[in-house]
Amino acid sequence: MIEASKLKAGMTFEAEGKLIRVLEASHHKPGKGNTIMRMKLRDVRTGSTFDTTYRPDEKFEQAIIETVPAQYLYKMDDTAYFMNTDTYDQYEIPVANVEQELLYILENSDVKIQFYGSEVIGVTVPTTVELTVAETQPSIKGATVTGSGKPATLETGLVVNVPDFIEAGQKLIINTAEGTYVSRA
């Protein structure tokens, strides 16, 4: 059992028959009354997100999640296909459950598949990935003063803010936790 006050982003627990992943968690002390935990959560099975509050002393069953190395094969219709690189077993995951992760990976990319018992519940991508710029505004000479950057669409459809000197066709290193530009590859 784990108390609500100990739940952090990325942890998974069971509540009301649902498998829930914590997206954001914060302590909140109102002017009057007791401390509460405000949380943004995702139902792992359905993909739906919701906000809720818990008392810090509420207890939940922590879910034991196992991960295995895998490779992203392809996406067809509403299903993404992955292969365990140790056993060569293939797994089908609904795109709705891994939509965010698919923005960071290309076919044949290495990932980790998350299991709850024998049920596939998600995918973990590397902390940084290398992606190519598909489309961005052209650079304007002498526009170095602003330093605000410009939006760039990458080959997976992800849109990130990049420095003005980045052009289409260049390979970039992207931080997957924050969805931000790190450097040129």
Curated annotation (Swiss-Prot):
Pathway: Protein biosynthesis; polypeptide chain elongation. It is found in: Cytoplasm. GO terms for cellular component: cytoplasm. GO terms for biological process: peptide biosynthetic process. GO terms for molecular function: translation elongation factor activity. Keywords: Cytoplasm, Elongation factor, Protein biosynthesis. It comes from the Bacteria. It holds the Pfam family Elong-fact-P_C. Gene3D superfamilies: 2.30.30.30, Nucleic acid-binding proteins. Involved in peptide bond synthesis. Stimulates efficient translation and peptide-bond synthesis on native or reconstituted 70S ribosomes in vitro. Probably functions indirectly by altering the affinity of the ribosome for aminoacyl-tRNA, thus increasing their reactivity as acceptors for peptidyl transferase. Belongs to the elongation factor P family. HAMAP family: EF_P. This is Elongation factor P. It comes from Streptococcus pyogenes serotype M1. The gene is efp.
